[in-house]
Amino acid sequence: MVPVIALVGRPNVGKSTLFNRLTKSRDAIVAEYAGLTRDRQYGEARWQGRTYIVIDTGGISGDEEGIDAKMAEQSLQAIEEADAVLFLVDSRAGMTAADQMIAEHLRKRNKRSFLIANKVDTIDPDLARAEFSPLGLGDALPIAAAHGRGINHMLQEALGIFPKDNAEEEGEGEPASEEVAEGEEPTRIPGPSEKDGIKIAIIGRPNVGKSTLVNRMLGEERVIVYDQAGTTRDSIYIPFERNEEKYTLIDTAGVRRRGKIFEAVEKFSVVKTLQAIQDANVVIFVMDAREGVVEHDLNLLGFVLETGRALVIALNKWDGMEAAERDYVKTELERRLLFVDFADIHFISALHGTGVGHLYKSVQESFRSAVTRWPTSRLTSILEDAVQVHQPPMVNGRRIKLRYAHLGGANPPLIVIHGNQVDAVPKAYTRYLEKTYRRVLKLVGTPIRIEYKGGENPYEGKKNSLTARQVNKKRRLMSHHKKAEKKKKDKRR
């Protein structure tokens, strides 16, 4: 499971700066959930091949009122959600009463905490350690978040307490370094979780019907092997079989009664949702048809797209809607979900079971598309045909040349294209290639990533040194050129 690390501390100690420093590899703040998780931001970060989730929180000063009290409450909640806490203090300002209050809270919660002395760029780190030693959280780790100093050592300490899971040890996703022999049929790359079948995460906003859908999927022709509580925050992993196919449902909805439909007010945990997406092969994204597409839906869909997981969209509570309402919702889906137009959309009623059975076909097709590998000859042939139909643009009077393509990874499919001037390939042309590969390979429900690699210039970075013979020749040419110029000037006079 992906570790979750919370950044806490009083205001203006550099939490947001450190958050941006840690998440810059993905260059994104995943989501801001106003009203649900006020002033908590969730980001995904990577360090030395390891993925982890960072929670940025509001400052805690101990004298909050009104909205500030709400922000402090959310910061304390982030501590409960996290697997480890990075407690930031300001080395320049020294220890304060607020620092002591937060340290006392962390000690009481018995949470694995690391004391981080920020802003040591102008202060002796040893002095900072001595200053904050009375907090009783061990030696402070000195960093300068603004300049990136001490970050690697800090992450080594913080992430070192978590065991690496199999996916991290084998590399992210399913690498496809092993080539398919020319002429072979495309094959499926077995994933590390194949013994549990396809892992399906049911995600969505609160009260869109996730619990009802889970119960409905388990209640139809089910053979439940066992219910196993997840290791983190009540996520439930439920292996089951349907039509001799193995699946594992990852239920993030919380309260659920097996055997009967039970729709409670769902406890929404961003951490649970993000971890479920990371651990799944396919995500079923549940939306409320009566509410349409809202901003929270787009935030979560953006994270699914960023992680590269296969996607199926289920529009729940479709029954009982008037024809005009349905037409409006379909128009909104076409307009606002263009960035995930590769995903199948199902209109269902989890309560009555309408359309639920069709989800399995889309799940299987999406998974198959995400983990299939293709030979280099096939991918190159598709590239050549695409270039012949629509050539890349000219750059500085020269045509971009795309020479060949091969598979660089799976889940999601990564197609590596080699050529010249590939840094100048426009995004619009990349989208054209993505759609071409999707259409020809008949890929459904999975994003495609295209990576370009240019040819290496063996003389790049080397100074052009002339031989003695070349130097003499250059001098003669320059001398001849000067004499010719002088004759021209004399004639003009």
UniProtKB/Swiss-Prot annotation:
Keyword Kinase set for record: no
Entry keywords, A to Z: GTP-binding, Nucleotide-binding, Repeat, Ribosome biogenesis
Basic residues: compositionally biased ranges: 471-493
Sequence positions that bind GTP 2: 204-211, 251-255, 316-319
Cited Pfam families: KH_dom-like, MMR_HSR1
Start-end of Basic and acidic residues biased regions: 454-463
Ranges of compositional bias, category Acidic residues: 167-184
Source taxon at top rank: Bacteria
Region of interest called Disordered, as start-end residue ranges on this chain: 166-195, 454-493
InterPro entries in the cross-refs: G_ENGA (IPR031166), GTP-bd (IPR006073), GTPase_Der (IPR016484), KH_dom-like (IPR032859), KH_dom-like_a/b (IPR015946), P-loop_NTPase (IPR027417), Small_GTP-bd (IPR005225)
GO molecular function, one term: ribosome binding
Gene Ontology annotations of biological process type: ribosome biogenesis
Annotated KH-like domain residues: 372-456
Matching CDD domains: EngA1 (cd01894), EngA2 (cd01895)
Residue sites binding GTP 1 per the record: 9-16, 56-60, 118-121
Annotated ranges, domain EngA-type G: 3-166, 198-371
Function: GTPase that plays an essential role in the late steps of ribosome biogenesis.
Family the entry assigns: Belongs to the TRAFAC class TrmE-Era-EngA-EngB-Septin-like GTPase superfamily. EngA (Der) GTPase family.
Subunit structure: Associates with the 50S ribosomal subunit.
Name of the protein this chain belongs to: GTPase Der
Organism (species): Pseudomonas aeruginosa (strain ATCC 15692 / DSM 22644 / CIP 104116 / JCM 14847 / LMG 12228 / 1C / PRS 101 / PAO1)
